[in-house]
């Protein structure tokens, strides 16, 4: 069973999009934590 290149490309793009969204959420939480530490 071989998948066409287009399907593989779509899977890669979806995977990268999910990683980017997760990385953005983690980065924002980390930034908020850094700001919280600076206040105290």
From Swiss-Prot:
Organism: Saccharomyces cerevisiae (strain ATCC 204508 / S288c) (Baker's yeast)
Record bears the keyword Nuclease: no
Propeptide segments, given as residue ranges: 1-2
UniProt keyword annotations, A-Z: Cell membrane, Membrane, Transmembrane, Transmembrane helix
Main location: membrane
One example GO MF annotation: enzyme regulator activity
A GO term from the CC aspect: plasma membrane
Record's miscellaneous remark: Present with 124000 molecules/cell in log phase SD medium.
Protein name: Plasma membrane ATPase proteolipid 1
Localization per Swiss-Prot or TrEMBL: Cell membrane
Assembly with partners or alone: Monomer and homodimer. Associated with the 100 kDa subunit of the plasma membrane H(+)-ATPase.
A Pfam family it matches: PMP1_2
Parts of the chain on the Cytoplasmic side: 27-40
Signal peptide: none
Residues that span the membrane, as ranges: 3-26
InterPro entries according to UniProt: Pmp1/Pmp2
């Amino acid at each position: 069973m071989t998948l066409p290149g287009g399907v593989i490309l779509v899977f890669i793009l979806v995977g990268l999009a999910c990683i980017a969204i997760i990385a953005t959420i983690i980065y924002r939480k980390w930034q908020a934590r850094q700001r919280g530490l600076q206040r105290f």
